[in-house]
Amino acid sequence: GLFDIAKKVIGVIGSL
């Protein structure tokens, strides 16, 4: 769902 996408984006930002 939309929240899952948000969590994925947060994960990508955290890896930067």
UniProtKB/Swiss-Prot annotation:
Organism of derivation: Ranoidea raniformis
Tissue: Expressed by the skin dorsal glands.
Task of the protein: Antimicrobial activity against B.cereus, L.lactis, L.innocua, M.luteus, S.aureus, and S.epidermidis. Probably acts by disturbing membrane functions with its amphipathic structure. Shows anticancer activity.
Name of the protein: Aurein-2.6
Matching InterPro entries: Aurein_antimicrobial_peptide (IPR013157)
In-chain residues carrying the UniProt-annotated modification Leucine amide: L16
Subcellular location, record wording: Secreted
Predominant location category: secreted
Record key words, sorted: Amidation, Amphibian defense peptide, Antibiotic, Antimicrobial, Secreted
GO biological process, one term: defense response to bacterium
Gene Ontology cellular-component annotations: extracellular region
Origin: domain of life: Eukaryota
